[in-house]
Structures are given as C-alpha cells and as structure tokens.
Swiss-Prot record:
Pfam families: KRAB, zf-C2H2
Species for this entry: Homo sapiens
C2H2-type ZnF: 172-194, 200-222, 228-250, 256-278
Annotated compartments: Nucleus
GO biological process, one term: regulation of transcription by RNA polymerase II
Taxonomic path: Eukaryota, Metazoa, Chordata, Craniata, Vertebrata
GO MF annotation, one: zinc ion binding
Biological function: May be involved in transcriptional regulation.
Protein name: Putative zinc finger protein 705G
Keywords: DNA-binding, Metal-binding, Nucleus, Repeat, Transcription, Transcription regulation, Zinc, Zinc-finger
Family recorded in the similarity comment: Belongs to the krueppel C2H2-type zinc-finger protein family.
Principal localisation: nucleus
PANTHER family the record matches: ZINC FINGER PROTEIN (PTHR24381), ZINC FINGER PROTEIN 705G-RELATED (PTHR24381:SF19)
C-alpha cells in the first residue's frame, strides 16, 4: 500500500468556467460549497492529509469571493507536446465584488505538473471530482442517503438526479421534507402536518382535523352509524377501509414489506412507521419548542 500523499485544496477543487459559474443560482453555488467541504471531509476520513488554506476558510464561512477556471492544456511549444500531457493549469484567485475582469494571467494561476494518482487503481485523476469519486469507489463508502427511498449514493452531485426519480410528474414539493405532489391542494394539505394546523373542527366535541373527510368520519362516532360489517365475525365499522383492513387479519395477508429489513405489515400505517425508523425522518414538529417527532401521535 502506497503512503498517502499530502493534498492541498487545489488538488480537490471542482472547476468551472467563468460562464458556468455565472449561470449558477444561489442554490447551485451552495451545493458546490457543500460538495467541496464534503470532498475534503471524505478524503480526511480515508487518511489523506489536507492542507487548510485560505480558500477552505472562505468555504467554511460561506463566502463566495472567488472563481475557478476549467482545467486546460497550455501549449506554446510544439516540442513539449508529451510534457504538456502532464501539465494542467487551474485559475484560482480571490476576487472582490467590484472585480468584473474576465482575463486570466499567469500571476493568478497555479501550475500542477503532475495530476493526482490514485493509490489503489494507479489511475491519473486531473479533476478533483474524479479524485474523490475514485477514492470512494475503492473504499465502498456511500455517505449520501435518499430521504424518500433510503438508497445510498456515493456522490453528493448524484443526489439531485436521484431526487427527480421521486418527483417526476410532481411539480409541487414541500421545502421542509422534500415530499412532492401532483397538485398544490395536496401540498397545502401535507404542510398542515408540519404546522399543526387543523381547520376542520367537530361542532359536538371540538376535536379538530386536517382534512374534511377525517371530520366526516369522526362525526359518525357520535351518530353510532357503522354501515360496514364483517360477514365472518359480524364486527361493524364506520369506514369500508377499516373493514378491508380487518378482513386481512383473517387471511393473514401482509401486503406491505420493508425492503430494508424484510419485515411485512398488514397495514400501510405500520409500514410507514417502520420506514421512518430507517430514514430517521421526524416530520412532526412542535410549534412552541421546535422538538420534532417521527409520529404525529407523539406530537399530540
């Protein structure tokens, strides 16, 4: 095993052209900062020594007063063609908000005579994203987990395309838990689980609900109306859904299976509760103290 070389920030910098950087909105630039800091963190966890530079401090403080240029070859002498294959120039210079210059000079450039070589595969990596991806491939680490399905991902940048799998055709997305819906009505109804809002109240007992259908179902408990009956045991229910759920207990049928633990459930509520255990999601937050819970019953 080769000894792990000491790296600088420039060795792990993902590079963009000035035009690409200008086209990135605030969220994309934030994602870039997160990727850079995560790259550094993962390399340290793999045993690499990272020199802490001024640029890293800028990143940690959330500042964006610098730009990068794309890696390219600088060919000014045709006799040095073979040598230039090992020479890469990256512009890495601090700027001020008043700096609108688009020129790049040798004074503001960093020459890397040798690209990074992976100790496991021996592959030459000229881009920092390739460096980190290569190291994570050998280590087997997949540090990013999808909140929706629990799938582990190796690269932070790959989480964005993965999210689109879950949100495809669903243009209304919750900014708190990233759940997506096909229409704004369902999104507003979902947000009530975060805010605790319950606009539908029973006029008899004042119990409140997030949905009108839940209120109508509740009102039947006051009237005693139970139109759905189990033919095997004679048990009656307020809703047809409750009857169907009861009948599954006779059949021993468990339709909902967790792909993580293999545990099966006869009811979707039990399946959803089990799924939250794996993801660690706590979507129900107290408006007074901010404490969050995985189940709405714990919040109440």
């Amino acid at each position: 095993m080769h000894s792990l070389k000491k790296l600088t920030f420039e060795d792990v910098a993902i590079d963009f052209t000035q035009e690409e950087w200008a086209m990135m909105d605030t969220s994309k630039r934030k994602l870039y900062r997160d990727v850079m800091l995560e790259n550094i963190s993962h390399l340290v966890s793999l045993g690499y020594q990272i020199s802490k530079s001024y640029i890293i401090l800028q990143l940690e403080q959330g500042k964006e007063l610098w730009r990068e240029g794309r890696v390219f070859l600088q060919d000014q002498n045709p006799n040095r063609e073979s040598a230039l294959k090992k020479t890469h120039m990256i512009s890495m210079h601090p700027i001020t908000r008043k700096d609108a210059s688009t020129s790049m000079t040798m004074e503001n450039s960093l020459i890397l005579e040798d690209p990074f070589e992976c100790n496991d595969s021996g592959e030459d990596c000229t881009r920092s994203s390739t460096i980190t991806q290569c190291l994570l491939t050998h280590s087997g680490k997949k540090p990013y987990v999808s909140k929706q399905c629990g799938k582990s991902l190796r690269n932070l940048l790959s989480t964005e395309p993965h999210k689109q799998i879950h949100t495809k055709g669903k243009s209304y997305q919750c900014n708190l838990c990233e759940k997506a819906y096909t229409n704004c009505f369902h999104l507003r109804r979902h947000k009530m689980t975060h805010t605790g809002e319950r606009p539908y109240a029973c006029h008899l007992c004042r119990k409140a609900f997030t949905q009108c259908s839940h209120l109508r179902r509740h009102e039947k408990t006051h009237t005693g109306q139970r139109p759905y009956k189990c033919h095997q045991y004679g048990k009656v229910f307020i809703q047809s859904f409750n009857l169907q759920r009861h009948e599954r207990t006779h059949l021993g049928k468990k339709c909902y299976e967790c792909d993580k633990s293999g545990k099966a459930f006869s009811q979707s509520s039990g399946f959803r509760g089990n799924k939250i255990i794996h993801t660690g999601e706590k979507p129900h937050a107290c408006l007074l103290c901010g404490k969050a819970f995985s189940l709405s019953s714990n919040l109440r």
